[in-house]
Curated annotation (Swiss-Prot):
Periplasmic side: 257-269
Protein's name in the database: Undecaprenyl-phosphate 4-deoxy-4-formamido-L-arabinose transferase
Any Pfam family: Glycos_transf_2
Organism: Escherichia coli O1:K1 / APEC
Membrane topology of the entry: Multi-pass membrane protein
Gene Ontology CC terms, in alphabetical order: plasma membrane
Lineage: Bacteria, Pseudomonadati, Pseudomonadota, Gammaproteobacteria, Enterobacterales
């Protein structure tokens, strides 16, 4: 039997990108939720290259009297998951909770995640109830969840919700993974022995707009497909085999038709030949694009450039920049 260690210190990791309107409320509510735990805690706010006043507000929050806030400033925008990984590399708690800065997932749910983790779970996920998102966001989320479940075999209900709790050894394992395209909830479930999901409230966004545009969702879909599995390459080989068999069958059929109806039939079959040709060319371009995605991922990983660059770290105790 594995020994279950009680949670002694909680680290809350929150990526921030142009969230100056929501920051005061976010800090107040997250601090209140952590105070109610009766445990040691820290709140790590990672500025992901914001162009508004977010970074300055984070520095002020860290330097306030009695603050528990650690501000991590990245030199530019690297994306949500890279920013969270930057926060993971600076945590000191034995339970790490991730949370979005838009307050759609209430910080008041944090005590429930801590209580569930204290039962011995490595990962505590959440499922958003009564989602306050647009029809497009809900549909895209369902498609992504189904894709992940099919490729990973992990039947988790809501991979898109970033309100999650991870034991320290899970975070340490993720930090040892150096691939550039990282999707944290899936990566955590790969290392987790015991994982569970609990329902949580979901509020309407009060400040700003979602940072996930249509194109960013498309890019996320490509990242998920290419960083999780090589199944698309196997499917591409299968598709190529089917097309080759189909092409050979059509060639045999055309020879039979020519012998049956004579050479005058050949001119009438030109348009069908063009249709078949364009179908094959289209399939080839799809395959080339998919191979290009995989090769691009390999090229990016082989260069081994850091996935983020931390410009400053402001801790409340010393109030000095690292």
């Amino acid at each position: 039997m594995f020994e279950i260690h009680p949670v002694k210190k909680v680290s809350v990791v929150i990526p921030v990108y142009n969230e100056q309107e929501s920051l005061p409320e976010l800090i107040r509510r997250t601090t209140a939720a952590c105070e109610s735990l009766g445990k040691e805690y820290e709140i790590l706010l990672i500025d992901d290259g914001s162009s508004d006043n977010s970074a300055h507000m984070l520095v002020e929050a860290s330097q306030a009297e009695g603050s528990h806030i650690v501000s991590i400033l990245l030199n530019r925008n690297y994306g949500q998951h890279s920013a969270i990984m930057a926060g993971f590399s600076h945590v000191t708690g034995d339970l790490i909770i991730t949370l979005d800065a838009d307050l759609q997932n209430p910080p008041e749910e944090i005590p429930r995640l801590v209580a569930k983790a204290d039962e011995g779970y490595d990962v505590v996920g959440t499922v958003r109830q009564n989602r306050q998102d647009s029809w497009f966001r809900k549909t895209a989320s369902k498609m992504i969840n189904r894709l992940i479940q099919r490729t990973t075999g992990k039947a988790m209900g809501d991979y898109g919700c970033m309100l999650r709790a991870y034991r320290r050894h899970i975070v340490d394992a993720m930090l040892h993974c150096h691939e550039r395209s990282t999707f944290i909830p899936i990566l955590a479930n790969i290392f987790a022995r015991r994982a569970i999901e609990i329902p949580v409230h979901h509020a309407e966004r009060e400040f700003g707009e979602s940072k996930y545009s249509f194109m960013r969702l498309i890019n996320l879909m490509y990242d998920l497909v290419t960083c999780l599995t090589t199944t698309p390459l196997r499917m591409l080989s299968l598709l190529g085999s089917i097309i080759a068999i189909g092409g050979f069958s059509i060639a045999v059929l055309l020879v039979i038709l020519r012998l049956t109806f004579g050479p005058q039939w050949a001119a009438e079959g030109v348009f069908m030949l063009f249709a078949v040709l364009f179908t094959f060319i289209g399939a080839q371009f799809i395959g080339m694009g998919l191979l290009g995605e995989y090769i691009g991922r390999i090229y990016t990983d082989v260069r081994a450039r850091p996935r983020y660059f931390v410009q400053q770290v402001i801790r409340p105790s010393s109030k000095e920049n690292e």
